[in-house]
């Protein structure tokens, strides 16, 4: 269903600032907290004493304390102490590889021995003072692949987002899709069009005229396990489009980290990074609020689509040219899942033979 030997965004640092956070990821119930020296830790959200969720407890001196009977858990899933009880021999619970990077907490739900922090996608905008970022989190009741489909085919903007970023020229512009290794790239360019409301506001935010024709671009990049980063923007027409000098354009990166909760639900970490007026905190908040409203327009569509697909599992869906980005992304996911299954089967055979 979803790759497990991969890094997913689990939460943001503020979510574990003062208490543990319980969150299901890839069908695994996990509790995140800050252990010794403030390092992020993640273990199974299950107390080995009576099965209570450890996320309902608290943290004391870097130890996770069960809120039911006070059992103390260490970062590696080992029981450390319990009031009035010797704990030697208590079974360990599963612990997870976690990393704090780029303003997010990342988790590896699979085999922690395979977890290499170097595999976390490099996010240039997150460590660069010339960029600003604002975002949020939505919980959506849909298969994570439906969200990938949605983001890799922005034709829907014309209809779902008609009052903000949609325009008829999106339908009319040709789409190009290519695959580079495990990365899928879908591109669309619209020349000499009028900017829709969201982008008129962005032009004004960058001190540019918003009532003149623009060249607009959308470059969607899928990377496994389920990340989609989209370069978007507008430039005054005839100034070079995507390659226009900064003084003629407003561009940004739409950030989409899609973390499966279950087979039919996701944690959707959304945001926008921009490299114009990065010190403008009010502009960052204005864009964040506007983008949040845009993404909220997708929620009902995706959730009702999921309900339809569950109700009619035998129905065959059409595949159109505009679906190429999503189709290719699913093929990448399928290859990774097949490789994980092959490795798991080989490991099982090896254990059986020993």
UniProtKB/Swiss-Prot annotation:
User: What Enzyme Commission number(s) appear in the record?
Assistant: 1.14.13.82
Pathway in which the depicted protein is active:
Xenobiotic degradation; vanillyl-alcohol degradation
Known PROSITE patterns for this protein? RIESKE (PS51296), RING_HYDROXYL_ALPHA (PS00570)
The cross-references to Pfam families, in alphabetical order and at most eight, read: Rieske, VanA_C
Family, per entry? Belongs to the bacterial ring-hydroxylating dioxygenase alpha subunit family.
Residues involved in [2Fe-2S] cluster binding: 47, 49, 66, 69
Task: Answer whether the UniProt record assigns the keyword Oxidoreductase to this protein.
Answer: yes
Q: Which CDD domains match?
A: RHO_alpha_C_DMO-like
Please name the source species. Answer: Pseudomonas sp. (strain HR199 / DSM 7063)
Q: How does it assemble?
A: This demethylase system consists of two proteins: an oxygenase and an oxygenase reductase.
Q: Which reaction does it catalyse?
A: vanillate + NADH + O2 + H(+) = 3,4-dihydroxybenzoate + formaldehyde + NAD(+) + H2O
Task: Name all Rieske domain ranges.
Answer: 7-107
What GO terms in the biological process aspect are recorded for it?
lignin catabolic process
**What name is this protein filed under?**
Vanillate O-demethylase oxygenase subunit
